[in-house]
Amino acid sequence: MLSISSLPETVEIVMKFFVVALSVALTSSRLSAQAPVWQPAPGHTQIQIWPGAAPDARPAKGPEFAKSSGKDDLVAGKQVIEIDNVSRPTMTVYSPTGKNTGVAVVVFPGGGYQILAIDLEGTEVCDWLTAKGITCVLLKYRVPAPRSAPYWGAYPQSPIALEDAQRTVGLVRFHAAEYHIDPNKIGVLGFSAGGHLVAAMSTHFDRRLYPNVDAADKESCRPDFAVALYPGHLAMRGNLSELNPDIRTHITRQTPPTFLIQDEDDHVDNVNDSLSYYVALKNAGIPVEMHLYAQGGHAFGLRRTKFPVTAWPQLVETWLGTIGMIAE
């Protein structure tokens, strides 16, 4: 039974509880204000790629947010915008600003399957492609949280990014007439982890990793061409000259023509990631072109540097002409 003498103490405890609760609420509000969600430029809209819950969905570690890199992580003197905790994947369609070639490219930003470098390896790529008359589809694929095992990482460790990629290519092909593109000229382009996703899409298009959702999933998700820049997760860790068997054993005559770029001084993803994939594609008779450079590092995107690799976009444009995607 509560005595009269204990009331002041009880009131004090209750007041402390409400003060703490209010402090937590205010802190959460400040954190939300400091962590904006990425949005594309005006005139462009993110499209949810799944009409309901995404397959293999798991609770995210926290809300999705975007942030800029620090002063020690500049690329060509500029910050990089990264997106974290993506659990609701979207695609954003950027129409050509130049004469429409009918070609479309689905772009996979890199980020180690932990974050997405959405400007360096996303929107800036779309600016280049659309200026060349190519429709760019930027995929914000799921990266639920850093190392949130077992749903973090490259396929087959985690299926979610590949599921999102398969779904997106099918959607683009299904809406080809609406987007004014040729359904037989849809390619994929990715950087780092996104480069691995390019290889996974090039070798895992014959079977969806998820049950069909709608008519778009009846379309082929095979890319008509593939471009991988400084890809990771391809060479075996114990033997860097050997291609990961999950990619190697799925290379067939239907694997699309492929273009590879990497630097020998890449300190994140070993140059053998590209070399091992190149050899496997060549041995399988797949048209493949590879450019290796002595210097240039990792994660340079399209930003101009002093190194020769900075001219890679022109090489890709020439290659697209040689494989019949655009006029030479």
Task: List where the protein language model places each region.
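Primarily recognizes the serine-hydrolase "nucleophile elbow" in alpha/beta-hydrolase
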Residues: 163-253
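N-terminal cap/lid segment of alpha/beta-hydrolase-fold proteins
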Residues: 35-99
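Acidic catalytic loop of the alpha/beta-hydrolase fold
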Residues: 235, 265-269
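C-terminal catalytic histidine-bearing segment of alpha/beta-hydrolase fold enzymes
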Residues: 271, 275-328
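Short beta-strand/loop motif that positions the catalytic acidic residue
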Residues: 260-262
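Active-site glycine-rich loops that stabilize anionic/oxyanionic intermediates
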Residues: 109-114, 264
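Catalytic nucleophile-loop/oxyanion-hole region of alpha/beta-hydrolase
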Residues: 117-118, 124-125, 139-182, 303-309
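Short beta-strand element of the alpha/beta-hydrolase
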Residues: 102-110
